[in-house]
Regions:
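Extended, low-polarity segments enriched in aliphatic/aromatic residues
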Residues: 2-61, 71-80, 85-374
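Terminal amphipathic helices with adjacent charged low-complexity linkers/tails
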Residues: 66-67
């Protein structure tokens, strides 16, 4: 497969030019108007942010994309699926309320919001995975699969379970119904380093599976039979006592996620946008966001989600770590085993390349790309 084209623009704004205008120009240069949207439903997949988290993409960006779709006669809607864990997005009613509190309204985004897998996260469609090795079918939110055109709008950042959260994760994990998320997460479970555990019980409060108990020494213990492997406890721990086990199970989560993403994108027009800004070390699913580990880099767009993620990852690997951050503090620790990899040095024991490898292997796209600046 030949290399794909990824379009890029930075965040510098001369007087009279806004970031929303730069995003519009990026999408036009990347070819969004070559997609036939006339009279068609267009799903715009994004993350509305957990309440308390402020790293998610602003609704203004969504409006740029929705406006472009409407200009082409499309019927756009913003969408995401419900979560496995407790929080403000575990069912459609609370999910919508969360989105609204974070600023996502029709007047601010230019379109309506539909929760992809319905009220309880059970409104799903089981679809085939093209060339799937780990998943022959994928359980995807029905509203997302009912759309004629699929567009992903992604906040690219670090992630405690997958190294980074990019386009493939936004699609693969984000579009999975509750059962679909369970299937992906079932492979990899976190573990506890007892010597670092302070017995604060915060991880147990965050666990939606009641999988964390405390032993006689008041140290956290994870019941591997109950654990869904969602990784929320990793981000909840302030003492780095809970970590993702770097083994075949964790790698399988990454590969399943790629296969789910391929199922969502298969056999219909797709377009992908990724904003590399507010690069927090962990997922936007947390009710807080830590200081960014890297400076804001820019906006990227492509028809190829694999090339897009690779381009964003390469840009992050080349960036200088910020000192007052999880990454900067890790690198400053005496005796730190430096990986020379900003994702692995921020969240050790995570191998992030498996997702891209699997996506390329099953034909979702290519990791080879040409970067064109807009």
């Amino acid at each position: 497969m030949e290399g794909s084209t990824v379009y890029f623009t930075d965040f510098r704004c001369p007087v009279g030019t806004s970031l929303t205008e730069k995003l519009r120009r990026l999408c036009l240069a990347a070819g969004i108007k070559t997609i036939d949207m006339d009279g068609r439903f267009v799903a715009i997949k994004m993350h509305f942010g957990e309440l308390g988290n402020l790293a998610f993409l602003r609704p203004n960006y969504a409006k740029v994309v929705a406006d472009l779709c409407r200009e082409q006669g499309g019927l756009p809607f913003l969408t995401d699926c419900n979560t496995l864990y407790p929080g403000s997005r575990k069912n459609a009613l609370e999910h919508l309320a969360c989105a609204q509190e974070n600023g996502f309204w029709p007047m601010t985004t230019g379109c309506q919001i539909l929760i992809g897998d319905g009220l309880r996260g059970t409104d799903e469609v089981e679809v085939p995975v093209p060339n799937g090795e780990y998943c022959k079918t994928a359980k995807i939110g029905r509203a997302i699969m009912d759309a004629d055109v699929f567009i992903s709008l992604t906040h690219f950042k670090g992630h405690e379970s997958t190294g980074f959260g990019g386009t493939i994760k936004n699609i693969g994990m984000g579009c999975g119904s509750r059962a679909g998320k369970m299937e992906q997460h079932a492979s990899g479970h976190p573990a506890v380093q007892e010597s670092l555990c302070r017995g604060c019980h915060r991880c147990a409060k965050e666990c939606g599976s009641d999988a964390i108990v405390y032993n006689e020494q008041n140290k956290a213990v994870i019941d591997q039979d109950k654990c869904k492997g969602c990784g929320r406890c990793i981000g909840a721990c302030n003492f780095d006592a809970i970590y993702s086990q770097c083994d075949s199970a964790n790698e399988m989560l990454d590969r399943k996620m790629a296969e789910y993403a391929a199922a969502v994108c298969y056999d219909r027009p797709t377009f992908h946008i990724s904003l590399v800004q507010d690069i927090s070390p962990n997922c936007d699913c947390h009710c807080e966001n830590d200081a960014p580990i890297l400076p804001d880099i820019g906006m990227f767009a492509s028809f190829d989600p694999v090339a897009l993620d690779q381009a964003c990852a390469d840009a992050c690997l080349a960036a200088a770590p910020l000192p007052n951050s999880q990454l900067g503090q890790n690198l400053a620790k005496p005796g730190w085993n430096c990986h020379h990899d900003n994702f692995k040095d921020s969240n050790p024991n995570i191998e992030w390349k498996a997702t891209l490898e699997q996506a390329e292997k099953i034909g979702m796209g290519t990791r080879r790309y040409t970067l064109k600046k807009v």
